[in-house]
Regions:
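ABC transporter nucleotide-binding domains
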Residues: 1-139, 144-164
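Short loop or secondary-structure boundary microenvironments that flank
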Residues: 17, 57, 186-187, 219, ...
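ABC transporter nucleotide-binding domain
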Residues: 124-216
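C-terminal coupling/interaction segments
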Residues: 217-259
Length: 259
């Protein structure tokens, strides 16, 4: 839909201020896309492939050379594409999508078929390109671990409906919006503390589990909770924030927590 292959059933799409339906040419000028395994001329070299696209898009030779260096293909760019590994073909496809210096890069299942080393290399190239070119990157993928490593914000979609849009904390590599904490207490105090915590206005829920007490509370309220429990002479062995990965959050939002 973002590249104009299908029309939206309702609403509108604007890319850099250009309406995709009424100003298609200018809107798509701001977009680059790599859809799974890019189609390339295997009998041509990598450079010849890029020059074919450059001529159509009026891209200078200098910009072609800059893009080749950006994706790290300068050592093999004059080899025939039929000799390229899958990872190199992905890099060449990425280079082709970057030639016109788009403001939006769309990647659809970009790491399908790549080995772990190829996935890591491709991820680093994308992150480098996004930083140097100052562009937004949309990634569509069913490989949640790769999305978690590559993206800083995710949208959970189920049956065409966005369930939530949340940030990923780059330092902890976990969902930034998560407010769960685990409170470890003695078994004798669990029920008593649960009843006390449920009275607090900044606590959404509190339940006993095998770890202790799982508490969901408002942001920046952990210190208030600890102070309240201490003032009421409850013995707390440990308290920590439970960090959830993308897969666990997906199960909660899309699958209802059922495994």
């Amino acid at each position: 839909m973002l590249v104009g292959l299908i029309n939206p059933t309702s609403g509108e799409i604007k890319i850099c201020g250009h309406d995709l339906k009424n100003d298609t040419k200018n809107a798509l000028r701001e977009v680059g896309a790599v859809v799974e395994n890019p189609e390339l001329y295997k009998y041509l070299s990598g450079r010849e492939n890029l020059m074919q696209i450059a001529r159509i898009r009026n891209v200078s030779k200098e910009d072609v050379e800059e893009t080749i260096k950006l994706v790290g293909l300068e050592g093999r760019i004059d080899d025939k594409v039929k000799k390229y590994s899958l990872g190199m073909k992905q890099r060449l496809g990425l280079a082709a999508s970057l030639l016109s210096k788009p403001k939006l890069l769309i990647l659809d299942e970009p790491t399908n078929g790549l080995d772990p080393s190829g996935i890591l290399d491709f991820r680093e190239v994308v992150q480098k390109a996004a930083k140097e070119r100052g562009m937004a990157v949309f990634v569509s993928s069913h490989i949640l671990s790769e999305v978690q490593n590559l993206c800083d914000k995710v949208a959970f979609i189920n049956d065409g409906v966005i369930k939530a849009v949340e940030k990923i904390n780059s330092d902890t590599n976990s969902m930034e919006t998560e407010k769960d904490i685990i409170c470890l207490v003695s078994n004798d105090d669990k029920k008593m503390i649960e009843n006390e915590v449920k009275k607090l206005t900044y606590v959404s829920s509190c339940k006993i589990n095998d770890k202790g007490l799982q508490i969901i509370l408002e942001s920046n309220s952990t210190s208030r909770l600890v102070k309240h429990l201490a003032c009421n002479n409850f013995n707390i062995e440990e308290i920590y924030k439970e960090r959830k990965g993308l897969e666990q959050r997906y199960m909660e939002l899309v699958e209802g927590g059922i495994r």
